Amino acid sequence: MSKLDLNALNELPKVDRILALAETNAQLEKLDAEGRVAWALDNLPGEYVLSSSFGIQAAVSLHLVNQIRPDIPVILTDTGYLFPETYRFIDELTDKLKLNLKVYRATESAAWQEARYGKLWEQGVEGIEKYNDINKVEPMNRALKELNAQTWFAGLRREQSGSRANLPVLAIQRGVFKVLPIIDWDNRTIYQYLQKHGLKYHPLWDEGYLSVGDTHTTRKWEPGMAEEETRFFGLKRECGLHEG
């Protein structure tokens, strides 16, 4: 696998970009997660960043990437509505793993947004999408720009939802390379990695949460529910960061 030209690929239509990366992705599927990270650092342009929501299994990708690339900027988009347990988990992992945490937030405070728009998350799919654009997408775009990112690592997995089932290891999103080192991991592999490295699930895992985001759009799992139904009232799975 040879080095890839981000500028040249960005000039191609989306379908052509996918085709251009197909051979590389076929080879990346054969590598383990650590090998994928190492390949990306050797063959894709910097600067490099890692995003995390500090969700249920966040410790895995944070540990895996950070041990290979210490001090990599870790981007968190903070909505102001995370669970108290999440904020404590962020502090715990930042200290334990010595993370180079970069927190980005909307330009409008949560209170100001509610005054202007009401509770957007109660306004159907359109309201949720506007909320996500303000609190997730715009801050992430700003983070990528300010950090001069050209390669973005994330911890998505195909097993998590139907919308992620066909994602490749390597793609281009928001004009940068996006690498998903643990895309093909199952829950058992996640558990084994956490055990091997003395890491923990998010504290709400023990209370029945399979996925954790904002307090107002996250539900505990109940028998018969798919994992994606625990977020955004089952109306959508993605918060916007990993779409497009």
Swiss-Prot record:
UniProt keyword annotations, A-Z: Cytoplasm, Oxidoreductase
InterPro entries with a match to the protein in the record: PAPS/APS_Rdtase (IPR004511), PAPS_reduct_dom (IPR002500), PAPS_reductase_CysH (IPR011800), Rossmann-like_a/b/a_fold (IPR014729)
GO CC annotations on file: cytoplasm
Active site per database record: 239
GO molecular function annotation: phosphoadenylyl-sulfate reductase (thioredoxin) activity
Pfam families: PAPS_reduct (PF01507)
Family statement: Belongs to the PAPS reductase family. CysH subfamily.
Protein name (database record): Phosphoadenosine 5'-phosphosulfate reductase
Lineage of producing organism: Bacteria, Pseudomonadati, Pseudomonadota, Gammaproteobacteria, Enterobacterales
